[in-house]
Amino acid sequence: MADISLDELIRKRGAAAKGRLNARPGVGGVRSRVGIQQGLLSQSTRTATFQQRFDARQKIGLSDARLKLGVKDAREKLLQKDARFRIKGKVQDAREMLNSRKQQTTVPQKPRQVADAREKISLKRSSPAAFINPPIGTVTPALKLTKTIQVPQQKAMAPLHPHPAGMRINVVNNHQAKQNLYDLDEDDDGIASVPTKQMKFAASGGFLHHMAGLSSSKLSMSKALPLTKVVQNDAYTAPALPSSIRTKALTNMSRTLVNKEEPPKELPAAEPVLSPLEGTKMTVNNLHPRVTEEDIVELFCVCGALKRARLVHPGVAEVVFVKKDDAITAYKKYNNRCLDGQPMKCNLHMNGNVITSDQPILLRLSDSPSMKKESELPRRVNSASSSNPPAEVDPDTILKALFKSSGASVTTQPTEFKIKL
């Protein structure tokens, strides 16, 4: 039997069923017999219209369950999970990140009111009665106001006086006595009452020689809130102090005037000491000419607190972080990252070394403790190196210590081990 298409099979079955129904032409009226003849004549036209009206593929397409459920092709899911598209979505230009952050910060925020200390001082001066007479039964804690005079290290090589001297002054402000002027020669009995505030002056070097007739001078103090003020005195120069004295913490101050003279010592040439207060500097090169200083500040302030950030000239910027860890984080985040289509080249200045953009592996080496020990070693050995010359180390000794061997042949003795179970 030859292969028959589905359309022909349906057509033959339909024709056979109609032939069986109309097999007895004598039964029925005239209209039925006329209808048989007309049906036989128009059978060919009916099959053509039937073929046009019905197609099995149309019926399958209408009742397809996949269309109702919304089943997607598995290849589309694979394309969505492709790692290359994820990488393209995550890596973006730093300018896009700046723009998105600016859009997020367009919401108006209430300006934070920063209270000036001078306003508080004036308010406190205008109403001293509230502070002079504290309520009975309450204990007022001792508030300390410290003023530090910072001496620049650059002028440390020019001592003014051959005998450096130290001076410590402690002045007690007693609100119950309602006095603002105190003499330094005042007896201890006059200030035996409980102090509510305490002010400390710390000075070093030849400052004592400029204070002639200090006992007759008087110090005026105002009623102020607890406040720490750092004043840079460029006019004051002091002799260089050893590193051990420089880093030594100040001890408790007494109420007496202490004058301590030290014998002059010949100090070695002072090395530049990297203070943590200076921060960690990072320079950014290869910037687009349209990058401004505001862009630099907004870009790097995300990584941590900035000491300063400025545009040296178009294409080069300088950023100084307060903490070293923040500078390392910014270096790892923005080194060789594109800003306005140009990769940023970051150079990190740390521990006296410069880590360029092509040497990120030096970050791991610069933070190792061995580097710190090597940098601190010359400072400790300076005093001893002048008297004793450095000892020469034999390379055979180093080989023997490291590999238990040397250049020459060494006789090895067998080692016996006794193990008790």
Curated annotation (Swiss-Prot):
Disordered as annotated region, ranges: 370-393
SMART domains the UniProt entry points to: RRM
Chain residue numbers at which the record places covalent cross-link Glycyl lysine isopeptide (Lys-Gly) (interchain with G-Cter in SUMO2): 200, 223, 248, 372, 418
Domain RRM: start-end pairs: 280-351
MF terms in GO: mRNA binding; protein-containing complex binding; RNA binding
Modified positions (Omega-N-methylarginine) in chain numbering: 33
Phosphoserine, modified sites: 5, 44, 127, 204, 215, 217, 244, 275, 383, 385
Subcellular localization: Nucleus; Nucleus speckle; Cytoplasm
Record's compositionally biased regions (Basic and acidic residues): 370-379
Protein name: Polymerase delta-interacting protein 3
Protein species of origin: Homo sapiens (Human)
Gene that specifies this protein: POLDIP3
